[in-house]
Curated annotation (Swiss-Prot):
Its main location: cytoplasm. Homotrimer. Pathway: Amino-acid biosynthesis; L-lysine biosynthesis via DAP pathway; LL-2,6-diaminopimelate from (S)-tetrahydrodipicolinate (succinylase route): step 1/3. It catalyses: (S)-2,3,4,5-tetrahydrodipicolinate + succinyl-CoA + H2O = (S)-2-succinylamino-6-oxoheptanedioate + CoA. The keyword Transferase applies. This is 2,3,4,5-tetrahydropyridine-2,6-dicarboxylate N-succinyltransferase. Keywords: Acyltransferase, Amino-acid biosynthesis, Cytoplasm, Diaminopimelate biosynthesis, Lysine biosynthesis, Repeat, Transferase. GO terms for molecular function: 2,3,4,5-tetrahydropyridine-2,6-dicarboxylate N-succinyltransferase activity; nucleotidyltransferase activity. Substrate binds at residues 106, 143. The gene is dapD. HAMAP family: DapD.
Length: 274
């Protein structure tokens, strides 16, 4: 079933310039809708960890992008207090109290999640935004004004602090999604974009900006990483001097490995997830 679905999506992607809301064949519409529905339920995800490596299901990302070609904009209501005009319905538009109870997570107004995003049990969405294709795993808090970009993968027991920006893949078009592994803490107003991977048990201080070209300097070893924060790292914003010493450029600095003191400062509050 999945292989046939993938083949149909891959072919539709090759023919994408000819597709429109009026011209798209029913089989393509149904295939894309199937993928979005499975993303919404967590049955499919854009990236999965296999062993030590993350594998990106590019065909699923293609389906997300194709969905924008298959729908017209339409008015949408948000509980009667606002009107919107978009192609993607909100995830909770038709949910009842029973639906929320069964899903087992909290949504604080006016948090918004788009259809095609997945929110796992015991997660908390403060007034925040979760885009299509994103995966938010169990026990994670998306704090106030944080944004989880399209197709981003957020692990278990992660804390995304206030104003954190997790980049998406749709615009500008990115090959791989941002991945925040289990038990990470991302400090206020930090930005993680361009498919950067934050490995498990890491702590990113407030105001740290990480993209593929950002130097991630380990002060203990002198090693420089790109696009990946090693597991268990504590990272702060810093600068590195140029070779000629005339100027310095922004970098992120791994100052130490996570210890008991760090964990005490960044521990999650189970009372907020009951």
């Amino acid at each position: 079933m999945t292989q046939a679905l993938q083949a149909l999506i891959d072919q539709a992607w090759e023919d994408r310039t000819s597709l429109s809301p009026k011209s798209a064949p029913n089989d393509i519409r149904e295939a894309v809708a199937n993928v979005i529905s499975q993303l919404d339920s967590g049955a499919l995800r854009v990236a999965e960890k296999q062993g030590k490596d993350w594998v990106v299901n590019q065909w699923i990302k293609k389906a997300v992008l194709l969905s924008f070609r298959l729908e017209d904009n339409a008015p949408m209501s948000a509980g009667g207090f606002a009107q919107f005009y978009d192609k993607v319905p909100t995830k909770f538009a038709n949910w009842t109290g029973d639906d929320f109870a069964k899903a087992g997570f909290r949504v604080v107004p006016p948090a918004v999640a788009r259809r095609g995003s997945y929110i796992a049990r015991n997660a908390v969405l403060m007034p925040s935004y979760v885009n299509i294709g994103a995966y938010v795993d169990e026990g994670t808090m998306v704090d106030t004004w944080a944004t989880v970009g399209s197709c981003a993968q957020i692990g278990k027991n992660v804390h995304l602090s206030g104003g954190v920006g997790i980049g998406g893949v749709l615009e500008p078009l990115q090959a791989n999604p941002v991945i925040i592994e289990d038990n990470c803490f991302i400090g206020a107003r930090s930005e993680v974009v361009e498919g950067v991977i934050i490995e498990e048990n890491s702590v990113i201080s407030m105001g740290v900006y990480l993209g593929q070209s950002t130097k991630i300097y380990d002060r203990e070893t002198g090693e420089i990483h790109y696009g990946r924060v090693p597991a268990g790292s504590v990272v702060v914003a810093g600068n590195l001097p140029s070779k000629d010493g005339k100027y310095s450029l922004y970098c992120a600095v791994i100052v130490k490995k996570v210890d008991a003191q760090t964990r005490a400062k960044t521990s999650l509050n189970d009372l907020l997830r009951d």
